[in-house]
Amino acid sequence: MIRLSKRSVSTLLRSGNQSFRIAAAASTSRSSPSATDVKRSDTESRWYSSLTNGQSKNSGSFAQLNMKTNWFMGYRNESSAAASDSSSQAPPPAEKFEYQAEVSRLMDLIVNSLYSNKEVFLRELISNASDALDKLRYLSVTNPELSKDAPDLDIRIYADKENGIITLTDSGIGMTRQELVDCLGTIAQSGTAKFMKALKDSKDAGGDNNLIGQFGVGFYSAFLVADRVIVSTKSPKSDKQYVWEGEANSSSFTIQEDTDPQSLIPRGTRITLHLKQEAKNFADPERIQKLVKNYSQFVSFPIYTWQEKGYTKEVEVEDDPTETKKDDQDDQTEKKKKTKKVVERYWDWELTNETQPIWLRNPKEVTTAEYNEFYRKAFNEYLDPLASSHFTTEGEVEFRSILYVPPVSPSGKDDIVNQKTKNIRLYVKRVFISDDFDGELFPRYLSFVKGVVDSHDLPLNVSREILQESRIVRIMKKRLVRKAFDMILGISLSENREDYEKFWDNFGKHLKLGCIEDRENHKRIAPLLRFFSSQSENDMISLDEYVENMKPEQKAIYFIASDSITSAKNAPFLEKMLEKGLEVLYLVEPIDEVAVQSLKAYKEKDFVDISKEDLDLGDKNEEKEAAVKKEFGQTCDWIKKRLGDKVASVQISNRLSSSPCVLVSGKFGWSANMERLMKAQSTGDTISLDYMKGRRVFEINPDHSIIKNINAAYNSNPNDEDAMRAIDLMYDAALVSSGFTPDNPAELGGKIYEMMDVALSGKWSSPEVQPQQQQMAHSHDAETFEAEVVEPVEVDGKK
C-alpha cells in the first residue's frame, strides 16, 4: 500500500474533484446520456461528495489511486447514496430560439436614428450606383458579354419638381430576382461586402478597388425623404426585369416582373423616390446638382443631372402698326429689319462631377496653378494659399492628402480656440464623409489648416458620418500634423520673408497655443516661433537667431513679459542686462508667457524670466557680495521690518544700475504681467490670486544715492518718520515701475504729493514770504476769516 502525506492527499482530492466536474459537465451536455454513464456519474458523485465534505466513516480505507482514470476507488459511502439518487437526473436539453424583430420599428430606427442629416440619402444612393458600375467593370474583364447592351458606364439623376419625384439610374450590374430578395429584403446585408470578399478570395483580384458599401443599410436612407421607393433592375445574368417596391411604414415589400415596354432598361438599376411632403424641396434640380458636387464630386463614374439650359439668339421684331410711315422715305431703299436678343430655354443632361480628383494624380505632374485653383474651388476662397503639401502615406495607414495654409485667418486673428471648423474634408474612396471634426484629425491649434484627406479604409460608424476613435485615426492624425509642420517650416525658410510675416501675423497665436497643449510637438513648434527682443524691436526674430547671437558665457534664454514693447524695454529689470549686451526677448502678447514657460527650454538653453528672483547673470563676485551684504545687511532687515508682509524678503540686487530698487516675483509665483492678466479674468476668486502673488522680493541697488541715504538714516536714526515715509514711497514706486498694480492708487498719490511738497518747499518762493505763508496756513486752520471788500483804485489814486 502506498502511503501519502496529508498535503498529497489534499492535492489529489482537488485534482480528482476538478476532473469529476469536467466529466460531469461533459456527461450532462449530451442530449441523451446512457444508463451506464448515469450510473457511473452517480457513483463518482457520491464518492467525491463524501471525500470533499468529510462525511466518510472509513477515511482510512480508500487510499488506492487508479492512475488510468484519475479517480479514487474505495468503499461506497452508503450514507450519501440516497441523496445522490435523487439528484442524478440529467437536466433537460436547452431549446434554441431566433431573435425576432418588429421590422417596421427596426426600419424606423435605422432610418431616423442612424443619419443626422437627410441630405446623405443622395450620397448613399450614388455610392450604391457607383458600386454597381464597379462590379460590372470588374466582371467584364473576364466576361465582356456583360457590358455589351449598354457600353456607357454612368449615373443619371432626374428631378421632377412639380410631382416631387427623384429618379436615379445607373448602367451597372443590376440585380436578379433573388438578389433583390437578398440585398433589399435583408437588412444589414451588403452585397458589396460579399463581392469584395469574393475578390479577395479570388486569385485574379486586383490590389485596389473603389467599392464603397460595407454595412448594408445605405439603401434604406432613401426613406429619410421618401415614403415610397420603387426599384426597377435588370441584370445581364437574367432576361427579365424586376420591380421592387416598398413603403416607409410597411414591414413588407413586393417584387414583380416588369412587363411595361416603356420602362425597360438595357441593364442596371433605376430607383424612383416619391418624396414625403416635407422633403419635396429635394426635387429641385439645382439642389440635386449642389448635393452631387458636395458629396459625390469625385466618384469614379460620370454623374449627369437633368438641368435647364439656355442660349441667346436674335429674333425679328414685328413693326408697330400704329407707327406712321414717312412719306418722304425712298421706296427703293431697303428697310433694315429690327431684331432683339432672347434666351432660348431647354432641358438636357449636364455633367456634374469631376471623375479625376487632383489628389490622385502624381504631385510632380500637378502645377502650382492647379493646386491654387482646386483650393479656391473646394473652399470657396478668392485668394491663393501661402503654401500647399501634396503627399501619400503608406504602411499601417494608407491615405492621400493635400493640405493648404490659407493667406488670412477666416475667423479673425484673435480666435484661436475655435475647435470645430470645416477646413478638412474627409473622403473615403472619393466619397465625401464629413468636414465637421472636433480635433479627430487636427488639434485645435492647427484648425486653420485646410485640405482634403482620402482613404480607402477608415473606421466609420454605420451612417458613415462620424469618424470613430481608433489607433488608425491616431496614426493618421500624427502624420497629418507632421506634414502640416513641414509645410509651415517651408514658409519660414522661404527667401520671401514677407510670406512668413503674413503667416505669423494671422496664425502666430495658434502656434503659441500649441506650445501649451501639444508637448509632443514642442520640437516642431519652437523653431517656428517669433518674438521681438531688446536688440530687434522692429523685426521679430526666431529662437534659432537668438541662440546664434548669445554671448559665449550666456547659459539661458532671457525674456520679460509685458503689455507692450515700450513698457518692456523701460522696465528696471533690463538695466544691467543691457549694459552687458545680453539680449532679452519681449513677450508682449497675453499668451506668450504661458507658451514660453510650457517650452521650458530650447536647444538645452532654459528660458529665464528676468523679473523673478535668483537671477544669475554669470558675474558673481563673492568677496564684493560679502562686503556689500555686511554694509547693507542690517538696512535690508530694517526695510523688511517696515514693509512687513508686503514682501517676503529684502535683498541686494544684481540686476539694477540706474534704479534704486525693484520688486521681483517669487521663483514659482506669477510675474507682474501674469498677475495683471489673471486679475482681468478673475470672477471673484481672490484666494488663488493672493496665494500666487504672495511671495515678492524687494531688491535694492546699493550704488544708488537714495539707498545710500536710507542706509545712513538707519545708521543715524532708524526711527525717523521721514525715513519711514521714504521707504513706503520707495516701495510703492518700485511696485509701479516693476509692472504691478497698487492696491490703493489714491494713497500712493497722496504720498507723492506729500513728498513733492517737502521737496519743493522754498524752491521758488522767497525766504521772507515762506514763514508768512506757513503762519497764514496755521491760522487758517484755527479760525475762519471773513472776506474784506476792497474798492478798486485807479493808478492816479482816484476811485
Swiss-Prot record:
It comes from Arabidopsis thaliana. Residues 322-334 have a biased composition (Basic and acidic residues). Interacts with P23-1. Residues 23-61, 314-337, 766-799 are annotated as: Disordered. This is Heat shock protein 90-6, mitochondrial. Belongs to the heat shock protein 90 family. NCBIfam families: PRK05218.1 (NF003555). ATP binds at residues 124, 128, 170, 175, 190-191, 214-219, 269, 464. The gene is HSP90-6. Gene3D superfamilies: 3.30.230.80, 3.40.50.11260, Heat shock protein 90, C-terminal domain, Histidine kinase-like ATPase, C-terminal domain.
